[in-house]
Amino acid sequence: MNHSPQSARPVSIMRRFLDSEAAGGITLMAAAALALIVANSPFAQTYFDALHLYIGPLSLAHWINDALMAIFFLLVGLEIKREMLDGQLASWPNRMLPGIAAAGGVILPAIIFAVLNHDNPAKLRGWAVPSATDIAFALGVLSLLGSRAPSSLKVFLATLAILDDLAAVVIIAIFYTAEISMPYLGAAFITAAVLFVMNRMGVVKLLPYLISAVILWFFVFNSGVHATVAGVVAALMIPLKPAPGRPDDMTSPLHKLEHALAKPVAFIVVPIFGFANAGISFKGLEASVLGDTLTLGILLGLFLGKQFGVFGAAWLAIKTGLAEKPMGASWVQLYGVAILCGIGFTMSIFIGLLSFPSDLMQTETKIGVLSGSALSAICGYLLLRAARPDQSAANPLWKADESPEAKNFGRFLCVFHFASYIASTYCTERLQAASSLLRRSSLEFALPGLLKRLIPRRFRAVETEIPVVRLHGAIMTGGTSLRPTLSLASTAGILEKAFADKHAPAVAISINSPGGAPVQSRLIYRRIRDLAVEHQKKVFVFVEDVAASGGYMIALAGDEIIADPSSIVGSIGVVSASFGFPELLKKIGVERRVYTAGSNKVTLDPFQPEKAEDIERLKALQLEIHATFIDMVKERRAGKLGDNPDLFSGLFWTGTTAASLGLIDGLGDMRSFLRKTYGDKVKLKLIQPQRGLLGRKLPGIGMDSGSVEPAQIAAHLGDGLLCVAEEKAIWARYGL
């Protein structure tokens, strides 16, 4: 049967793709991307339920991580043995540069992670997560550069990654072993001994080795040592020498098994692992997870620790004469490859799953690994694409002013930051959040200030940092993102966040409120005082335009109250306001029917004429609330209040007069006051409302719920207009 060239072409294209160096990395990236999409799609629940589906004694996720990945580690072990005995690592001179660089790439990321998490033993278990390099992913990115990257760099990266994997295997075997079962461990040693004896006796048939490897996996799995170690041990026992009478080394059991496993592992095993473990649901995740020390430790360990550890160790080895620089590679290209070593994906996620049983910590681990790996892949690729080969053996390490590749990389950073600022100005709220997050991240990677923070606090001079909370708006429930208001529901989160800063000696609260609901005012006041006592912090309140009525009640939570000379302060009283429509229904021909059980259930009905007894009852309630307000002022301002008879009459004053009456402690502004109190180097840190991982505002300052949908806006438009009118009326009492 004849085939046309057209019908044969798709097959040849697929074959070329599968044979390319980048194929494994591209497939893994696609699997990870697909997992993220599915985990945040309508099929998310099905995806997670499937992973927790039990097949025999284990869930599907455990079969993938404990059994399927043993095949991956079997291939890793085969590659390590072949390279050590008959490859790039067969001689000590060839081992020196990648070996020293790999050591630096394991040690420095672990140190960065440990420094950030030294005070949390549970998180510290993940110290090895950022120490691994994903060989398929890293080589896949490097191969995308084609001839731009010298072959010596590819050999260097492959060799370094193999040594990295060897270190990871040793770390897993030593540090991530559960409670040991000695009978099963003994059986595992006996099985390994059988494999060793078969090797020494010259057995070259693969089947006995594979059967023994499965038995070894079973015993190791039940011993408490992680089952994937069985794959490496079995690989080390498989003969590298060919069968007698077969001089071709490629006929050896090791070569045949390695060749048979290469494509299934690259295109089936590893992508399945990536798909099963890269799925992160962003629903309900807060942006604060990006600032968690666990996430940061992994992200910075991979992105900064790897590149500085690998490149620094390689530079020292080359400069001291212990090793030679890869032929034809420039220093910038070597640095680019060091950045690519921060692609940790497969092995990093695997170690993370061993380190943390908690779902939240595993999610933070995956976010850190994905973020650090993505940054390393993008920056490493861009730098290598801009770099040029070594022109001279005597080329100095860095000539920033003359190096074309450095200039190109600088241009890239400038364009990136300019684009992100444009996005922050013109894009939607969600894109603004993502853009500013990326911009801040790239700046922090570039600035030495972040590196300074990696040093333990007791070993560095730390500037005093004061959290600042801004409370702005009328005090009432029911606010939205379109009409922000103050209530306990809207302020509790941001207040908790401000007082949680254990290094801050105080919290500064900037208030600009004309008052509103007395209950919400007192609840906010009470929450501030409770947090101040709980965290043993001073509270400084700074008045902007106005702190009147309920706004002043909140201000009483401060140990000191500072206002501008022109601020409006006071209005210690109670006011109730509503509308009356006693004739409206009659004029429009509507009859209102009200049925009650209880003679006072229609008190202050706006559709009925005012009643004297209703007004009297309301006045009594107001007097009780007023008395509570007065007691609060006298308690918090004890020994400071003046004798003005109008102090509690509801009048309000400028900041200058309020200071003379003892309602505030002084005049000034926040920055000047705090600099005078804590020194010129004090820093103010504005506490922002929390956002979800994708930039959506979470319930917080100025609103009781999340974002408002168009249907909600339409449904509550009338109510919203009345509330806006009421709020405007409150501000208008003070000429604002």
From Swiss-Prot:
Spans annotated as Peptidase S49: 388-736
CDD domains linked to this entry: S49_Sppa_N_C (cd07023)
Superkingdom field: Bacteria
TM region positions: 23-43, 58-78, 96-116, 126-146, 155-175, 178-198, 201-221, 224-244, 265-285, 298-318, 334-354, 367-387
GO MF term list: peptidase activity; sodium:proton antiporter activity
Leader sequence segment: none
Region annotation Na(+)/H(+) antiporter NhaA: where it falls in the sequence: 1-387
Record keywords, A-Z: Antiport, Cell inner membrane, Cell membrane, Ion transport, Membrane, Sodium, Sodium transport, Transmembrane, Transmembrane helix, Transport
One Gene Ontology term, aspect cellular component: plasma membrane
Subcellular location(s) of the protein: Cell inner membrane
Catalyzed chemical reaction(s): Na(+)(in) + 2 H(+)(out) = Na(+)(out) + 2 H(+)(in)
Topological type in the membrane: Multi-pass membrane protein
Keyword Nucleotide-binding: no
Pfam family, one: Peptidase_S49
A single GO BP: regulation of pH
Family per record: In the N-terminal section; belongs to the NhaA Na(+)/H(+) (TC 2.A.33) antiporter family. In the C-terminal section; belongs to the peptidase S49 family.
Record's function text: Na(+)/H(+) antiporter that extrudes sodium in exchange for external protons.
Protein name listed in UniProt: Na(+)/H(+) antiporter NhaA
Organism placement in taxonomy: Bacteria, Pseudomonadati, Pseudomonadota, Alphaproteobacteria, Hyphomicrobiales
